């Protein structure tokens, strides 16, 4: 059987040589190689694909990364032509609070802001931001786990994300930042994009980062913090973070260890702190919505 197998291989090879050898006259019975599509054919196929209807029900989300490209296209066609680029950070926040504090707050804030606007989507949160120097380590970089990028890296990232959205057809690009160190880079990125585009379509909403306003609102609600415990942490921000995920401030572990306070205010019971956080989030989100609408209107 092995001899016959070898002979079969030789016969097939000879036939292939005769069929494919150069200069052989075309034979309707001979196999032909598939022709690669022309550039025109590839473009026609793309145009057919880009116009395809969504074959399934769309996801109810305002987060671009959670959507399919078809869902983004259809959302834009339905009027969602404002894109929000939220910036957070990965930085030390004391012994209880996760490094991604600002990112967790933004998960709740950007979602609510986009839905209240009714015409907006959120990009993925920009989590890598300037947090201090490398060598020597400065600022939050003195603490393990903090991640930093250079100012120019941060600004270029913001510009590239904003320009990506612009070329897709988003009419207004909104920058909001949950950390103070992000504000200058966002303002610079918005200014650079507006200069490139020749029109004011990128907007840095500095008023989102109104810590004094949030504290004043908290005081109106009957809560005042005492002297600082010396950590990069506050009760008002912890309460807003807990509306998204109490485990990110180690709620259960702190209660068990008798450490459930910050700056003289107890974060227990959980339900009361979350209720306050929801009111503070609502106040800041509503203010931000107004500021975004004013920026888009040119006021």
PLM regions: where:
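Sec-dependent N-terminal signal peptides
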Residues: 5-13
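Extended, histidine- and acidic-residue-enriched regions that form the cofactor-binding/catalytic faces
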Residues: 2-6, 18-174, 178-299
């Amino acid at each position: 059987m092995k001899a016959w197998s070898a002979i079969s291989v030789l016969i097939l090879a000879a036939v292939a040589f005769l069929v494919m050898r150069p200069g052989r006259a075309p034979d309707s019975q001979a196999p032909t190689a598939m022709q690669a599509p022309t550039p025109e054919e590839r473009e026609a196929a793309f145009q057919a694909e880009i116009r395809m209807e969504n074959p399934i029900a769309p996801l109810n989300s305002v987060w671009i990364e959670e959507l399919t490209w078809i869902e983004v296209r259809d959302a834009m066609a339905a009027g969602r032509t404002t894109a929000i680029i939220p910036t957070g950070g990965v930085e030390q926040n004391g012994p209880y609070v996760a490094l991604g504090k600002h990112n967790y707050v933004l998960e709740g804030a950007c979602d609510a802001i986009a839905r209240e606007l009714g015409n907006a989507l959120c990009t993925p949160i920009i989590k890598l931001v300037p947090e201090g120097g490398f060598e020597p380590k400065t600022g939050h970089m003195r603490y393990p786990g903090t991640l930093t990028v250079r100012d120019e890296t941060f600004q270029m990232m913001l510009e590239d994300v904003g320009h990506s959205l612009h070329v897709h057809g988003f009419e207004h690009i909104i920058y909001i930042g949950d950390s103070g160190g992000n504000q200058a880079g966002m303002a610079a990125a918005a200014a650079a994009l507006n200069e490139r585009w020749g029109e004011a379509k990128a907007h840095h909403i500095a008023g989102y980062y109104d810590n004094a306003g949030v504290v004043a609102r908290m005081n109106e609600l009957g809560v005042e913090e005492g002297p600082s415990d010396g950590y990069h942490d506050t009760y008002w921000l912890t309460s807003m973070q807990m509306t998204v995920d109490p485990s990110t401030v180690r709620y259960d572990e702190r209660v068990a260890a008798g450490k459930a306070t910050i700056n003289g205010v107890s974060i227990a019971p959980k339900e009361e702190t979350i209720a306050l956080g929801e009111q503070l989030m609502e106040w800041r989100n509503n203010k931000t919505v107004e500021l975004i609408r004013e920026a888009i209107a040119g006021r």
